[in-house]
Amino acid sequence: MGGTLAIQAQGDLTLAQKKIVRKTWHQLMRNKTSFVTDVFIRIFAYDPSAQNKFPQMAGMSASQLRSSRQMQAHAIRVSSIMSEYVEELDSDILPELLATLARTHDLNKVGADHYNLFAKVLMEALQAELGSDFNEKTRDAWAKAFSVVQAVLLVKHGN
């Protein structure tokens, strides 16, 4: 049943929305390390306890995080993973790709509240980075794409 829900949710994302997500993602990947680092700095600002899930980065200030090799390495991993998801938005493979992430997040006690915060922060970071390219269609496309990803993750978590 989980796979069916995921595939059905993917069907709700239009071809035009997928194109917008892919186009803007490619724009963002020109500065992937700084973009993803900014996302995590925003997460840690909203929820300082989330930073403790990364022992190697616990207690670092925003400026320390920006120059941290650990944060840069994590940003590269996250941007690579997200690039896979963006490319596979219309693929039956997406739920399986997300299952691996769900297992890792389960081990680190990352759940629905964290995904909701990530969605909020991602939208803020998208708007800040894309500027005037972040219009209503872009916002709607990203909101829908993230809702697809989040729905699959929550099914894989068993929530």
From Swiss-Prot:
Residues 12-158 form the Globin domain. Gene3D superfamilies: Globins. One of its GO terms (cellular component) is hemoglobin complex. Heme b binds at H74, H105. Pfam families: Globin (PF00042). It comes from the Eukaryota. The modification N-acetylglycine is found at G2. Keywords: Acetylation, Heme, Iron, Metal-binding, Oxygen transport, Transport. Signal peptide: none annotated. GO terms for molecular function: heme binding; metal ion binding; oxygen binding; oxygen carrier activity. Caudina arenicola coelomocytes contain four hemoglobin chains labeled A, B, C, D. Belongs to the globin family. Monomer. PANTHER family: GLOBIN-LIKE PROTEIN. This is Globin C, coelomic. It comes from Molpadia arenicola.
